[in-house]
Regions:
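Repeated loop/turn-to-beta-strand initiation elements of outer-membrane beta-barrel proteins
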Residues: 44-46, 78-84, 109-115, 142-148, ...
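Mid-chain, structured segments of secreted extracytoplasmic proteins
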Residues: 81-116
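Surface-exposed, polar helix/loop patches in the mature regions of secreted/periplasmic/lumenal proteins
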Residues: 106-147
Length: 188
């Protein structure tokens, strides 16, 4: 499922809901909404999606499992937003997740910077990495309804994240994407 709800300054809420067919790709596939690079004061956006996760660590590999993926973003002012994200990282034998809170700043129509805090937790090793992180989001139109996007970040605890994919604008308030996300962190 992918849901995008945008609440503009006039307090009217447009809700769109679409059921997605299963997307079969190798690695971590993400189905949700395309990352934002522009913000208008007072807007709130909710992105809900699914991710198929495969875990690898020191010769260990756990099979794919579908997970919840979601973000809520609120524009504090034009070009500046705060975002909370939850990313399920569960695989067949490992229960993990990443939660993050970031401040996002628009650089241009196609680029934004983000920085904040991330928490990567794994039940398998009973450990949590609390990380400071920074990164960049890029997005470009490939046509009137299709975007290509990328997101890359680095953080403490030898953490790197990147994501890339394509987004399709179904309506003014709904877009759907399919992409690949990579998360790597030090298991301490």
């Amino acid at each position: 499922m992918c849901v995008r709800v945008i609440n503009g300054g006039n307090n009217t809420m447009n809700k769109k809901l679409v059921a997605l067919l299963a997307v079969a790709t190798m690695g971590i596939s993400v189905v949700g909404a395309t990352p934002q690079t522009q913000f208008t004061k007072g807007e709130t956006q909710v992105d809900l999606g699914a991710a198929s996760v495969e875990t690898k660590a020191d010769g260990f590999k756990a099979a794919h499992k579908w997970n919840f993926d979601g973000d809520i973003t609120h524009a504090l002012r034009d070009k500046t937003a705060i975002q909370y994200g939850y990313h399920g990282l569960n695989s067949k034998h490992v229960d993990s997740n990443m939660q993050e809170v970031n401040l996002i700043q628009t650089l241009s129509k196609n680029f934004a910077l983000y920085g904040g805090w991330g928490r990567i937790h794994s039940d398998a090793i009973k450990h949590t990495n609390n990380i400071a992180q920074v990164g960049i989001i890029g997005k470009a139109a490939l046509g009137s309804k299709v975007d290509v996007y990328g997101k890359a970040g680095i953080g403490t605890k030898e953490t790197t994240t990147w994501e890339a994919g394509l987004g399709y604008k179904a309506t003014d308030d709904l877009d759907i994407n399919a992409g690949y996300r990579y998360v790597n962190t030090k298991a301490t």
